[in-house]
Structure formats: structure tokens, C-alpha cells
């Protein structure tokens, strides 16, 4: 059925289209933290996230990364390939920050000699727990070969993103990716890439990401607008 709500999320809603293999993603003006425990409506946020993510995914597509992104169709909407989402959040850390610093008792801002890839089990009831490769296999999420692919592809994407953000004066601290199986059973990058799911610091150490909301550091949309303008100029 066309235009049927398939999924209602914290930051995005997903609808069916005339093509059973294509979905319409609508970005919402909502910011959340602590797995939705704190919610706030922020005018214009959805459009900024959509435009930033569209620009990043277009560049990833051109760089040869297989993604679900098809095209942006309005300021807060885009068309994507339908995928079966793998219930893992794949996190890559270039610099210590956030929950990593709290978990291991290290200060924020330490550059990691080798970027660290982590898995988190996508399960709201369990608060998305940190898990390892053995847990992933025990839960039957993906196999050894697919785990290796997820890690390798995440590292490849990191190298591309670090380079692009460095060109616009931003340091990519860490980020979260989601992947899914397309209709042919191939793993492709899904979800979004925006300051909602990454940390970006400018040369002065200012936060240019969702930490502005988490830590009450200022106006979130002003910061996202700066990131968007920098990416447009790239």
C-alpha cells in the first residue's frame, strides 16, 4: 500500500511507496537522548538532518560505498532502498569521548592510535547494550564473515569521512552506523549520517553535533546549519 506508515521512530518516520523496494523517509523536528527519555521539538532540525545526511550519502555513493540512499525529494524527505535492518549499532571511535570516556575512566580528547569499532545490540527494552563478536554470533545477528565485513566497511567509511570533514575544519570524533540487507541479500549502509549520530569538534574544540542538545551548550539548529553550509561548500 502506498504512503502507509511502516515505522515510527524517534527522529524519523518511514512510509511505503508505489515501489515495494523503495521507502520514503521523513525526518522529524525532534531531538531525543537517553533512548528517548528526554524529548524536545526543535523547529527545522528534521530538514537540517535530512539535507546533511543526503549530502554525505551522495558522496559515499560516488566513492563506491553501497548505501540505501536514492535521492532527496524535499527538505525533510528522501527516498531509500528498503532493507532488513541488522539490529546492531556499529560505532567507530577516533578520539575518546562520551560513553567511552565514562566507561573506561579516561579523559575526553585522547586520539586513539587505531580507531576502535564497537557493537551495540539495537534493543530499546535493553537500552542498546554494548556487546562483542561472540554475543553477536550467539544472538544469531550475523556470522563471522559478515562481522568482518561490517568492521572493514565501517573503517573504510571512516577514512572517507575523516578526510571530508578535515577539509571543512571539523574533526570526526566518533560515529554510529547502521546496516541492512537489501533485496539481493547484500549488506549495505542504511539509516542516516548527521550530527545526530556522530561527534564533530571544530579546531577550537567546540561541539558541532548533538552534544549541544545533550549538554545544553547552545542552539542546536544554529550548529547544524553551520555544518550544512560547510558541507555544501565542500
Curated annotation (Swiss-Prot):
Matching Pfam families: SAICAR_synt
Metabolic or biological pathway, per its Swiss-Prot or TrEMBL entry: Purine metabolism; IMP biosynthesis via de novo pathway; 5-amino-1-(5-phospho-D-ribosyl)imidazole-4-carboxamide from 5-amino-1-(5-phospho-D-ribosyl)imidazole-4-carboxylate: step 1/2
Record's keyword terms, sorted: ATP-binding, Ligase, Nucleotide-binding, Purine biosynthesis
EC number, as in UniProt: 6.3.2.6
Reactions that this protein is recorded to catalyse: 5-amino-1-(5-phospho-D-ribosyl)imidazole-4-carboxylate + L-aspartate + ATP = (2S)-2-[5-amino-1-(5-phospho-beta-D-ribosyl)imidazole-4-carboxamido]succinate + ADP + phosphate + 2 H(+)
CDD domains: SAICAR_synt_PurC (cd01415)
Signal peptide: none
BP terms from Gene Ontology: 'de novo' IMP biosynthetic process; cobalamin biosynthetic process
Alphabetized GO MF terms: ATP binding; phosphoribosylaminoimidazolesuccinocarboxamide synthase activity
Alphabetized InterPro entries for the sequence: SAICAR_synt/ADE2_N, SAICAR_synt_PurC, SAICAR_synth, SAICAR_synthetase, SAICAR_synthetase_CS
Enzyme class, first EC level, given as a word: ligase
NCBIfam families reported in the protein's UniProt record: purC
Family of this protein: Belongs to the SAICAR synthetase family.
Protein name per Swiss-Prot or TrEMBL: Phosphoribosylaminoimidazole-succinocarboxamide synthase
Provenance organism: Streptococcus pyogenes serotype M3 (strain ATCC BAA-595 / MGAS315)
Name of the gene this protein is made from: purC
